[in-house]
Amino acid sequence: ANDTGMSAGKNAGAKGTSAATGSNSTADPLVYDHSMELSYAENFAVDYYEGGYKLLTTRLNGDRILLVPKHQQAPKDAEALVSPSAEGEPGKLIVLQEPVKNLYLVASSVMDMFVQLDSMDAISMCGLKEEDWYIPAAKQAMKDGTLLYAGKYSQPDYELLLSQNCSMAIENSMIYHTPEVMEKLEEFGIPTLVEYSSYEEHPLGRVEWVRFFGALLDQEEKAD
């Protein structure tokens, strides 16, 4: 299943790119610069490369997201990129072009972090109905029609996700109870990120996941 994930991730990464050089051209290998220093969180890593590239890793499954700056290309060696601090086998690679948008947010506890980061506009679909949200900003976005209900984790509305050009689904580990949904999403070229904030032992480790999403959304300064 890993291979399909990888190719799906690559396809999804090509969405929304406007680089005139075509999708086959690749950039030179990346040069590692530094890593985000974390105080409490143990389940993710963020590594920075020269030229504005970033590699986000979720440690429990080894999955990686390569963020490619606007108008840049993914490097030739993208598949081989591994966080210097990662242990174990690398998982799938998802390539996303910045700015990251059209997300399908199923892990509802993360919505608060997007609100803190002032990045609600990166999410266009979610896994809760308007009446089930306890976060006023999410309720309001659904009222305004800027946030659409795209089905719960076990029954996503694939048609809606595709029509909204969904770039990635952000799930919690519940998705592992329905592996067929994960496979179907990948088949449609929609990669899945499983967030593990609830697996952090230290309560402040959970809170620190805002920095993971800050890196994803290019809002590091708001996350600190």
List each model region and its residues:
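N-terminal hydrophobic or amphipathic helices and topogenic motifs
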Residues: 1-99
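Phenylalanine-focused residue identity feature
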Residues: 44, 114, 153, 188, ...
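Extracytoplasmic substrate-binding proteins
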Residues: 146, 159, 163-224
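Generic hydrophobic, helix-prone segments enriched in Leu/Val/Ile
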Residues: 44, 138-143, 212, 224
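A short, structured surface patch at a secondary-structure boundary
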Residues: 54-162, 168-175
